[in-house]
Amino acid sequence: MLPEEIIKRPIITEKSMSMIPQKKYTFEVDRRANKIEIKKAVEQLFGVEVEKVWTMNVKPKRKRVGRFEGRTKAWKKAIVKLTDRSKTIEFFDSLI
């Protein structure tokens, strides 16, 4: 898989933004990607050094519209910690 296919989008929440000073960044990633692929993709796309990767599968939630019931899609979340000597990811710096 290409790095652009692995990293889908950044997760911008209050909790994820509070982890940026510790050099932890949160992304939605492809469900088939493993930690090694995620690490390589972040290093290639952003030019940083990754120390550790945590992943979690987010289960779908039930949603109703009137009498019809459906589900949101299941997705995979990755939290990436950069090394101390690594530079920060510029995209997130503009959000703080």
Curated annotation (Swiss-Prot):
Q: Name one GO biological process term.
A: translation
Q: Which UniProt keywords apply?
A: Ribonucleoprotein, Ribosomal protein, RNA-binding, rRNA-binding
Q: Where does the source fall among the domains of life?
A: Bacteria
Question: What Gene Ontology molecular function terms does this protein carry?
Answer: rRNA binding; structural constituent of ribosome
NCBIfam families membership: PRK05738.2-4 (NF004363)
Q: What task does this protein carry out?
A: One of the early assembly proteins it binds 23S rRNA. One of the proteins that surrounds the polypeptide exit tunnel on the outside of the ribosome. Forms the main docking site for trigger factor binding to the ribosome.
Family the entry assigns: Belongs to the universal ribosomal protein uL23 family.
Q: How does it assemble?
A: Part of the 50S ribosomal subunit. Contacts protein L29, and trigger factor when it is bound to the ribosome.
* Name under which the protein is recorded: Large ribosomal subunit protein uL23
> In which organism is this protein found?
Caldicellulosiruptor bescii (strain ATCC BAA-1888 / DSM 6725 / KCTC 15123 / Z-1320)
Give the lineage.
Bacteria, Bacillati, Bacillota, Bacillota incertae sedis, Caldicellulosiruptorales
Gene name in the database record: rplW
